């Protein structure tokens, strides 16, 4: 397509298609916010971790080592904490393709993230793998003081790299 600079996905599970899609095009391909993890990892001390929030941790965990390998982070599972939202009240609407009650879900996400930080004080960065979680990113940043990255952050990162810098000559 004319004017397309890259191909993006918005769900961590799209990482399963990263290599296939990359081979089909000459465009940059970034199918998941999980692809930001190699960039985020060097900001942390070796003892610190990245938490990946996902719609369903039971489904994501078995495939995460392969996804991390695709990102160049093979053998790095110990640097990640995976937390699922499958038990957050109201979040089941996502899996059921129903309307989500954001107020109900926000309360559950807050509790989940605060518990995560209490259980894992070594978590210093949050990556929202699920597209639906982006709506809660600002609140999570506010209550944790931690950086939060999601599908929008992933796309913005690439887009900013393609944008002209108005302060520099062409």
Q: Model-predicted segments: where are they?
A:
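Active-site rim beta-loop-alpha module in soluble metabolic enzymes
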Residues: 60-61, 65-120
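Gly/Ser/Thr-rich loops at beta-strand to alpha-helix junctions
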Residues: 5-18, 30-36, 55-59, 129-135, ...
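Long, charge-dense
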Residues: 32-81
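Metallocofactor- and cofactor-centric catalytic cores in central/energy metabolism, strongly enriched
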Residues: 1-8, 20-22, 114-116, 122, ...
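C-terminal functional extensions of proteins
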Residues: 129, 133-135, 149-170
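Short, acidic/small-residue loops that bind anionic groups at enzyme active sites
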Residues: 20-44, 141-159
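Interfaces and regulatory segments of ATP-dependent nucleotide/adenylate/phosphodiester-chemistry enzymes
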Residues: 126
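A C-terminal functional module that forms or caps the active site or interfaces directly
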Residues: 108-114, 131-139
